[in-house]
Structures are given as structure tokens and as C-alpha cells.
Amino acid sequence: MPTTFQEIPRERPVTPLLDRADTPAGLRRLAEADLETLADELRQELLYTVGQTGGHFGAGLGVIELTIALHYVFDTPDDRLVWDVGHQAYPHKILTGRRNRMLSLRQKDGIAAFPRRSESEYDTFGVGHSSTSISAALGMAIAARLQNSARKSIAVIGDGALTAGMAFEALNHAQEVNADMLVILNDNDMSISRNVGGLSNYLAKILSSRTYASMREGSKKVLSRLPGAWEIARRTEEYAKGMLVPGTLFEELGWNYIGPIDGHDLPTMIATLRNMRDLKGPQFLHVVTKKGKGFAPAEIDPIGYHAITKLEPADKPAAPKKASGPKYSAVFGQWLCDMAAADNRLVGITPAMKEGSDLVDFSERYPERYFDVAIAEQHAVTLAAGMACEGSKPVVAIYSTFLQRAYDQLIHDVAVQNLDVLFAIDRAGLVGEDGPTHAGSYDLSYLRCIPGMLVMTPSDENELRKMLSTGHLYNGPAAVRYPRGTGPNAPISGDLQPLEIGKGVVRRQGEKVALLVFGVQLAEAMQVAEQINATVVDMRFVKPLDEALVLELAGSHELLVTIEENAIMGGAGAAVGEFLASQAVLKPLLHLGLPDIYVEHAKPAQMLAECGLDAAGIEASVKARMARLGL
């Protein structure tokens, strides 16, 4: 196996067994004695594939043996296999007829980064967000019962995803209806960032405790049929502790708990799954794996190797670096530390995205004011509300797509009470290769309808910093949404001064056409304006809208064009149209934004071009409307 990033194979490895097992039917024709060799080949294939395309890396390496065992024992796709999140699903894709398409992974018109029902009958449930698998598999199990079907339902969930309340809601309901289903806990002590909280510590005790306890009866029944396995388990103190601690938790929830077992021991896993396959009622198998298994750097640094970029050919000269500014996330991270130094009321909250949201420095400098609540978005928002009630100034750093999961808490717990909570909304707009499940396409629409909410859209790095200060000092709930990636390298002011609320800025004066920009498309709008001599306005605020400026522009221009990287329906452009209608102002409007579709995965630039939000697309749309109006 490779021991460095540079040693990842750049040519497809020789895989005689995998060549015969590119579907589960082919896999099940292999002798069980060949499966460990198959696992080695599949791991090499995964290293090669992700090296060519980039993508999620460590999670898939950790479930090679588990994936083989599941497809070997269960009759997929008739038996329903549901993966949680989907980071670990690449080996599943390779074994289910998509090996020859894996080099199109995460690319335009290629296969998706996550399981998709439209892509394969083996992808029984579309995922991307965490903690949904048990609910989905339970629904499938109940449907099978109603249809008098003997098909099995299996959910594979990581220990990180198990921290979310939704997972426990499903566990509780499954025992209530006595569903015939299997939940497999893939325990690698990781989600994306290292797990936190009581449950993670609870499970971690299986590897450290010296407490001895008798084995659970359910485990004994299964493992006693495995040659040698019961004797090994009997002698293993970690196993004994696992039966006492995690077993108690899940048994109390009404599940028959088995484990923990070694998730890289194929014979034991296959035998255990066979024994559990026909057991009635809710079954829970605890499997311990190592994220990044088989690639030493990923085993040592599972956070850093959660995902990787594609390898460039060894003989390819390095491309000259384009001048660009810092990442928007980095601008936020620096502002957070600066404001924390100036205001000791500030606290930072994240739902398991410390690295992605650039909170590492803050967490080290202000550990007592940093709170990683794990994958628990609803809790994160209401936690912030409680802190705000007592005079703290919480900043919730969260991806746009994940804030959707806490919408009720945002309204009921924060906005209705007019609490001082700032939402730093990262990954707004189109995010690229992860596709529609991770796109931040709707936040302007679902935020601007909330009474009292301050909603801001920065056009560059400096605007982001100023808006964060504005939101922090605002009396009430505030949101700043910013995209993935780097800015245009605007000079950044070091101060913490706020903006005047509800006031846009005219960046270029032109004639006839006014481009009203909400967000980072300002640079593209300026390019277009040079071609058609248009006025360009950085609107800054979606709510409150700069109504006086909108009226002024409507009175002095023949066409108003709104530009945003958000759904057109209900977005910032709709706010402009609604206001003009309320004032009985009839003015031609053109709304440019995300269409009423799910924009499929591709490079961000390709996605923007597809939506007409690059400079060429904006220019073409505006010129077409001008022609229709005779301008």
C-alpha cells in the first residue's frame, strides 16, 4: 500500500478479482477465501480513482471490508442498503456497476459524490446530509411489512452522525414498531472533525477501559456459532467493556446489540451478518473501523485526509498561480478572533465544522468561548438563543445547507424573541462538486421572510468583515451569507466598524440599465457594465432593502436587473419586485439567479455558467432583454 500522497497510483492497478466482482452478483460468486485479496484490490482501486478525481477519501478507505461483507451477505439491491451521509459510499459505487464511470466522479455530467436514487438501483436513498439513514431504512422496513415482503433493510451510520437527535428519534420509533431492520454503527471515532460529547466518549471507552463484565446474551448467541470468535471475544477486555457500556445504551432503547467487532476482519463480519440477517426485530451491530485504513497518512491525519484534491500528472509543469484573495472562511475566522479580543461577550458555536468554517485559531485562542456541539444544528441554534438571553453575543458558524435543518429554531427560538444571534453562513450559493445536497441555494429566500432579521450579502472580503461587525453589533438576529472559495483580493480594513444598515452603494454610474447586485457577482456585473454602459449597485442588504435607492434607480433607468446567487423564487430580486409593486411603480425587471431546478455537480465556474451567472451569461441575458425593450 502507498505510504505517501505521491505514491498513490496514477495508473489503474491490476485487479483480477475486482474485474469479476464489479456487481454484487459477481461478488457473491467469489469464494469467501478470496475476499481479503479483493479488499486489497478494492482499496488500491479507490486510491487510484480518488487520486484522479479528488473527493472524499478517508471514510471510504475505512469501510472497504464492511462494504464487501454487506453486498456478499445481503441480496442487494432487493435488500435495501442505506448509507448515511455518503462520504463512505465510493467502494459501494465501485462494486455496484459504476467502476468504469468513477473517473467522472463529481464532474459535470458524471456520477455524483453521494448515493443518488436516479443513478443506480443500488442507491436506495439519496443522501448528503447526516443522520438520515435510520429513519429512511425504518420507513423501508415498515413498507416491506405492509407489502408482505421479506426484503431486508440495513442502515450504515457513523458515530459522528449518531450524535444528531434525528438518529435517536428513529432508534426510538423502530423499537416502538418492532421493525425488522439492521443498523450498523461504523465507529471510527470521526465524523468530519473529531467527535465531541458524551456519546463519543461513551463509545470510546471500549478501547480503554479495564472493566470486566459478562457478555450480553444476544451477542453470545450469535458469536458462539463463529469458530474461534467467542473465545477471542471472551478474552478481550475491550469487547467485554463494549458489551457493558454501549450495549446497555442501545439495549435500553429496545435494540438487540451485537458487538463491537473488528470492521476490518472479513470472516468475522460475514459470519456475524449471516447470523443476524434473519433475526427478527431491531438489530444493532457495532463495528469498529479505522478511517483512512490502508493509507498511512490518512490513518495518522483523518481530518486532513477527509477529502483530497486530484493528483496532477508527475510530468505536468506547475500552473502559474492566479492572484486571488484569502478564502472567505479565513476572513471570517480572522474577524472572529479580532472581535473576540474586543468584546468578551462573543462566543463561537459550530455544529462539527471547526476546520471548514475556519474556527481552529479561535478555538485555540479562546477555548472557553468556543463550542463545537457536534452534528446537532438544531441544538446549536437554540444553544445560541439561550446564551443570548443571558447577555452573550453568540456567533453561529454554519454552512447554508445545514442551517436549513434548524429553521424552526431560527424562527421560534431566536427571531420571535429578537435575540442577538449572528449567523455566519458559509458555502452560500453553488458549492461545486458536492452538488445540490450541499448547495446554499435558498438562504436569502428563507431568511428575508423572517420579521426583524438583518440579511447581508458581501461582495468581497472587506465587505464581509464589515458586515460581520454590523451583524455582531445589531440588536436582534442577523445573517451574513458568503460563498465557498476566495475573494477578489480586495484590501481588507483592520477595523471593526459597522456599515450603515440598509444602505447600498453605487459602484458605477451608467445609463438606461441598472444592475442591482446582491453578493459576489459584483465583479462580473462591472465587466458587463463596461460593455453596455450600465449603472452598477452593490446592494449589500437584502433586508432591510435600500428602498430609497431602488426608487431612485427606477426613476432614472429603463431596466432594473437584479443579480444574486440564490434561488430566483423568493430571493433578493423578488424583494425588489415586491417593493416596487407596493409603491405602484411599473418598471421592467430582469431577475438573474438560480433557476427552479437542482443544479447538478460540476466545477463552480461551470455551474455559474450553466445558470447564466458568469459575465458572459449576465451580458447575454441583459442584452436580450434590452433588445426586447428597444433599448
UniProtKB/Swiss-Prot annotation:
Reaction it catalyzes: D-glyceraldehyde 3-phosphate + pyruvate + H(+) = 1-deoxy-D-xylulose 5-phosphate + CO2
Involved pathway(s): Metabolic intermediate biosynthesis; 1-deoxy-D-xylulose 5-phosphate biosynthesis; 1-deoxy-D-xylulose 5-phosphate from D-glyceraldehyde 3-phosphate and pyruvate: step 1/1
Assigned protein family: Belongs to the transketolase family. DXPS subfamily.
One protein family per Pfam: Transket_pyr
Chain segments annotated as coiled-coil in the UniProt record: none
Cofactor: how and how many bound: Binds 1 Mg(2+) ion per subunit. Binds 1 thiamine pyrophosphate per subunit.
The protein's name: 1-deoxy-D-xylulose-5-phosphate synthase
Lineage top rank: taxon: Bacteria
Binding site for thiamine diphosphate: H87, G128, H129, S130, G160, A161, N188, F295, E377
A single GO BP: isopentenyl diphosphate biosynthetic process, methylerythritol 4-phosphate pathway
E.C. number: 2.2.1.7
Gene3D superfamilies, per the entry: 3.40.50.920, 3.40.50.970
GO CC term (a single one): cytosol
GO molecular function: 1-deoxy-D-xylulose-5-phosphate synthase activity; magnesium ion binding; thiamine pyrophosphate binding
Cofactor list: Mg(2+); thiamine diphosphate
Lineage per the UniProt record: Bacteria, Pseudomonadati, Pseudomonadota, Gammaproteobacteria, Pseudomonadales
Record key words, sorted: Isoprene biosynthesis, Magnesium, Metal-binding, Thiamine biosynthesis, Thiamine pyrophosphate, Transferase
Function: Catalyzes the acyloin condensation reaction between C atoms 2 and 3 of pyruvate and glyceraldehyde 3-phosphate to yield 1-deoxy-D-xylulose-5-phosphate (DXP).
InterPro entries reported for this sequence: Dxylulose-5-P_synthase, THDP-binding, Transketo_C/PFOR_II, Transketolase-like_Pyr-bd, Transketolase_BS, Transketolase_C
